[in-house]
UniProtKB/Swiss-Prot annotation:
Catalyzes the decarboxylation of orotidine 5'-monophosphate (OMP) to uridine 5'-monophosphate (UMP). GO terms for biological process: 'de novo' pyrimidine nucleobase biosynthetic process; 'de novo' UMP biosynthetic process. Homodimer. Substrate binds at residues 11, 34, 61-70, 117, 179, 188, 208-209. The active site is at K63 (proton donor). Its EC number is 4.1.1.23. GO terms for molecular function: orotidine-5'-phosphate decarboxylase activity. Disulfide bonds: none annotated. Gene3D superfamilies: Aldolase class I. Belongs to the OMP decarboxylase family. Type 1 subfamily. PROSITE patterns: OMPDECASE. This is Orotidine 5'-phosphate decarboxylase. Pfam families: OMPdecase.
Length: 233
């Protein structure tokens, strides 16, 4: 099922910066928030408990990639935090992804990273030594993710349709690199607007700097949310 709230990437260096940002929003507004490596390493597990205590949904974006037993044990810990979604690298393999699923349980969604949206085809071929097209690599990882019993993948919006065709229509496609029309692209190589992401079939969209660094973050959030949901029935 599609998530009507854009997922806000909390790319902040400290707990206090997050508190200041969230204080801009009405207390009763439930947000979907992404906690990445920088914030999690700075604030620790307490940041997840804090956000959940405020009534928000949390996507813990740590991209685990290790041997199966280590990932399984880590996921058991994350399940106790009450995260709504977390992820692993599909490149870790089917056995690792199955172990992650077992450790996390079924209460939270578990998705896998295919290729980072900062990765170009030339970079993939040169540094990862994968001699296929970028799209073929993404489809391969998506199929293996589905085989492992995960809920979906992180992918570029341009890849959503082929992934759903290769897996199934309910396979979650979470797409970062979302920018409203006219916004700076930054370090993302493959970007798309919220409206285009909806039309192409994305289930979740992740938006960071266009919201967190906006002059009015609350207004920016609602503008993006309106663009994302404008054609919903």
């Amino acid at each position: 099922m599609r998530e009507h709230r854009p997922v806000i990437a909390l790319d902040f260096p400290s707990f206090e910066a997050v508190k200041e940002f969230l204080a801009l929003f009405p207390a009763e507004e439930s947000l979907y928030l992404k906690v990445g490596m920088e914030l999690y390493y700075a604030a620790g597990p307490e940041i997840v408990s804090y956000l959940k205590g405020l009534g928000h949904s949390v996507f813990l974006d740590l991209k685990l990639h290790d041997i199966p037993n280590t990932v399984k044990s880590a996921m058991k810990v994350l399940s106790q935090l009450g995260v709504d979604m977390t992820n692993v690298h599909a490149a870790g393999g089917v056995e690792m992804m199955k172990a992650a699923r077992e450790g996390l349980g079924s209460q939270a969604k578990l998705i896998a990273v295919t290729q980072l949206t900062s990765t170009s085809e030339a970079q993939m071929q040169e540094f990862q030594n994968i001699q296929t097209s970028l799209q073929e690599s993404v489809i391969h990882y998506a199929k293996k993710t589905a085989e492992a019993g995960l809920d979906g993948v992180v992918c570029s919006a341009q890849e959503v349709q082929v992934i759903k065709q290769a897996t199934n229509p309910d396979f979650i496609c979470l797409t970062p690199g979302i920018r409203p029309a006219g916004a700076a692209v930054g370090d993302q190589k493959r970007v798309m607007t919220p409206a285009d992401a909806y039309q192409i079939g994305s289930d979740y969209i992740v938006v960071g700097r266009p919201i967190t660094q906006a002059e009015d973050p609350v207004a920016a959030y609602h503008t993006i949310k309106d663009e994302w949901t404008q054609d919903w029935n």
